[in-house]
Regions:
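Conserved core segment of the aminotransferase class I/II
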Residues: 165-245
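Conserved core of the PLP fold type I
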Residues: 1-137, 142, 148-172
Length: 245
């Protein structure tokens, strides 16, 4: 029989516990959505970000980023622009983001942290201010925790203990966080990951999403409008394996 579009209960529960243990985020099972790798989670996230509002068809990348994410935007008919993190950090980064957001065309902001391939990491001050920008302008923050916990300047390896891995989820409401099993657990072959959807935006309704994928509520648009029409969910085998990890 087919796996549930939004994931098996075992992985949703294990994912919720993992997120609490290492990111100190409190979410429910319904906010944990297994995908066929983080790339699928990012693909659906970008599709929704570019269609939450009319005329916001641009994704802003904090570069360098995994090149395939830009190819995804092109495939989706979205415009891609970037800010090079080598040149902009701290307040300079925030001011540059604000300049791009001011044109009213940005639907989503996407980054990876630790960054693939530069290994740079956004700090909590930057994350807090990016969250404020996204919440104020109803922009979707797409956070790819690509090499999760692999910033070895701090020890993030002890569950349920500080320090916790920095995440946009501690500061904002309009976010999706992607966690890759390929990198976190050296589990690339079966193509499995989890997307954590902000409890706030999960329930939010967008008339433009209704026009785009027949689902007005954001969470339904992700699982039924995105996962169902692309891969009909993620395989049972991969989900059970990841849940055990």
């Amino acid at each position: 029989f087919y796996p549930p579009f939004d994931g098996i209960p075992e992985l949703k529960s294990a994912g919720r516990n993992f997120v609490k243990a290492f990111l100190d985020l409190d979410v429910e099972n319904k906010h944990i959505i297994p995908t066929c790798g983080s790339l699928q989670g990012g693909y659906i996230s970008q599709a929704l970000a570019g269609n939450m509002h009319k005329n916001r068809k641009t994704i802003l990348y904090l570069d360098p980023t995994f090149p395939v994410t830009r190819y995804q935007a092109k495939f989706l008919g979205l415009k891609a622009i970037g800010i090079d993190l080598y040149n902009y950090r701290g307040n300079k980064l925030i001011e540059e983001i604000k300049k791009h957001v001011a044109n009213g065309k940005i639907g989503g902001i996407l980054w990876s942290s630790p960054n693939n391939p530069s290994w740079s990491c956004l700090n909590e001050l930057e994350l807090k201010q990016i969250a404020e920008i996204c919440d104020m302008n109803d922009i979707l923050a797409i956070e790819d925790l690509a090499y999760i916990g692999m910033d070895f300047r701090k020890d993030y390896s002890v569950p349920f203990c500080k320090p916790f891995i920095p995440t946009i989820g501690k500061f904002g409401e309009n976010w999706i966080t992607l966690i890759s099993a390929s990198k976190a657990f050296s589990f690339p072959g079966p193509r499995c990951a989890i997307s954590i959807i902000s409890p706030h935006i999960n329930e939010k309704k967008y008339a433009n999403l209704k026009d785009f994928c027949e689902r007005e509520q954001f969470g339904h648009a992700f699982s039924l409008g995105g996962l169902y029409v692309t891969t009909s969910g993620t395989s049972h085998t991969a989900q059970y394996a990841l849940a055990k990890m």
